[in-house]
């Protein structure tokens, strides 16, 4: 089985996800993705015709953040038209899913060069874009809701911790154990390099 390697990683700056308030909120989501894809191409002297696929993730795949965001961002970045793209929506797990799928494609031998990433502009999420319409993972499907009631991540995390017997002290201990790793990562520059945005 082939090995899969992460060669580089890049991200845009974070900002407030409110139009009129956030520094990046007025930008098109495809432009955010294109900025990252262009940086990866330039930093690695990448011939984009060699890219087999671009697997992109998003949450709330609608409006300007809808469609095949990965493919459109690649075209906006000037990638060769041979570089295909696919976009998936697995809510907050979209980014890690794209990396897993990219590795699987490479390890299976189906593809050689895959770029994985994602874009989420909070100004497009239902709760922020239209506060009168609360976000529902079941999209208003009452039959599904009756069979499988769903809740948000914070409530789910609290319920799981309660069921598994993880109390606040244990959560705090995990935080204290993981913080030195985070500090070490920052100081040794193992963190993802950010890409400035032209606003």
Question: What is each residue range found by the language model?
Answer:
Residues 1-83, 121-199:
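Conserved "HGTGT" condensation-loop signature of ketosynthase/thiolase-family condensing enzymes
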């Amino acid at each position: 089985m082939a090995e899969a390697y992460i060669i580089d990683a890049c991200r845009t700056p974070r900002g407030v996800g409110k139009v009129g308030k956030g520094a990046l909120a007025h930008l098109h989501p495809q432009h955010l993705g294109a900025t990252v894809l262009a940086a990866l191409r330039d930093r690695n002297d990448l011939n984009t015709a060699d890219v087999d696929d671009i697997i992109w993730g998003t949450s709330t795949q609608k409006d300007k953040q809808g469609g095949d965001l990965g493919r459109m961002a690649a075209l906006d970045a000037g990638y060769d038209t041979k570089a295909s793209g696919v976009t998936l929506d697995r809510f907050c797990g979209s980014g890690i899913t794209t990396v897993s799928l990219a590795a699987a494609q490479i390890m299976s031998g189906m593809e050689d060069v895959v770029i994985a990433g994602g874009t989420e502009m909070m100004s497009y999420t239902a709760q922020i874009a239209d506060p009168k319409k609360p976000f529902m993972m079941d999209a208003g499907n009452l039959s599904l809701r009756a069979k499988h009631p769903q809740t948000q991540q914070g409530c789910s995390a609290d319920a799981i911790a309660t069921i598994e017997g993880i109390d606040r002290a244990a959560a705090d201990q995990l935080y204290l154990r993981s913080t030195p790793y985070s500090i070490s990562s920052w100081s040794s520059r193992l963190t993802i390099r950010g890409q400035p945005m032209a606003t």
